[in-house]
Structures are given as structure tokens and as C-alpha cells.
Amino acid sequence: MDLKGKFRYIFFDADDTLWENERYFRAAEAKFIDLLADYTTPEGVQDMLWRKQEDNIPLFGYGSKTYMIGMADAALELCGGTLPEHIYYGIKKIITDLAFHELEIIEGVKETLQALQGHYELIVATKGDLPEQMGKFRISGLAQYFHHCEVMENKDEKNYLELAAKHNLAPEQILMIGNSVKSDIAPVVNIGGIAINTPHEVVWVHEMMDMPESDRIIIVQNIREVLDYLL
């Protein structure tokens, strides 16, 4: 599929597309499982944490704050309604480490953005906690390549239609690049846009979804390969 010159804007996902994210949450999850090892099996801790995350996302949205609340809720239930002091401080340490980890840019991202800059208007289209996502965007060193950063409440068809309207685009004029089939690929092609999938080896369970069949989806093995379609 030749996309050269067919789009004015390119929208990029952020977490696990531009920089590493999920691997840090997996590391936090492993520490949490160890912390609660005396209360149930590793599978029991993991299942409880996942269920509490799913319960809290509709209330608090996406991001490490929701993850922190989910950990506290899971620990409280697993501990029988009373949170021991060492569990409380253990959770606090896990969340602190998660919140202040070094931001690691994914290999090939900077070179790809440098090549595209000047040919397209590049926009980050991510979801999550606004201050958290904007903070990562600012310290990433990538802001110089982007027109601006959109932090969306969610990433479904409705949100992408709103994004298109905001930029005076028809839905079929959206070109989205991202790692998540559920958030970056399926909703975009469902409204008529084009999506380029840059798979990541670590996928959040909440984002797992089979790839839809569509001739408007391109799958690349690393982000540098998008240049073959765009320049």
C-alpha cells in the first residue's frame, strides 16, 4: 500500500510505540505478586489485580494512579480487609519505582520522526492520565518533532471521530501508527481510516485483541519500516 503524499497528518500512539511502558508495569506486577506471596498463589494475586484494574478503569481512567488504587484494592481483599503496614509500604515502594522510572525511547523512533518531520504534521494521540502523559511527552525529548500531543479519554471509534472533527478531517483521512490492536488499529479502520501496527512484545492484558481483517491495515516489524510506505 503506497501512502506517499496521501495524508497531511500522521497520528502516533505513545506508550509502547514511542517509548517503553508496559514492561515497567509488568515488573511492578511481579513485585506485587512477591509482596502478597503469603496470602495466595501468584495466579491468585495476578487475577485479583487484573480484576481490580478492570473495575477501576471506568471510574479513574488509565494510568499509574489507577494501577496504584487497583493494587491497594487487591491487597486489601487478599489480606482480609486489613492492610498490614509492611504491605502498605511495599505497595508505596512499587508505585514510587513505577512513577519515577527512566523513560526509554524505543529503538528507531527518533530517526523515523526526523525523517517524517517536514513531510507531514506529526501528532501524538495517546490516552491516559493527562498530567502523567504530558509529563512523559515533555521529558521524552520527542516534542520537537510533533505539532502537539492529544491525550484522549479513551481510544474507541467515538474518540477517533472526535479527533478527526477537531482537525477538520474526514474519518478516512486519519492515519494512525501504534502497537495496540484494540486502541490504535481496530477503531481507526472501523471508521474508515488507515492504521499501521508496530507490534510490541509486551502487551497489556486489557489491550489484547485479535487483529481484524482489513486492507487498510499495515503491519511492520519495527517503526523504521513505516518510512517505506510514507516517503
Regions found by a protein language model. Name each.
Residues 47, 52-97:
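A metal-dependent, Asp-based hydrolase signature
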Residues 25-33, 68, 72, 130:
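An amphipathic alpha-helix signature
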Residues 1-48:
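Active-site neighborhood of HAD-like aspartate-dependent phosphohydrolases
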Residues 38-42, 80-82, 141-144, 168:
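Short helix-capping segments at alpha-helix termini
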Residues 1-7, 110, 114, 129-130, ...:
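Asp-based, Mg2+/Mn2+-dependent phosphohydrolase catalytic module
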Residues 86-104, 109-140, 149-152:
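Substrate-recognition element of Asp-dependent hydrolases with the DxDx(T/V) motif
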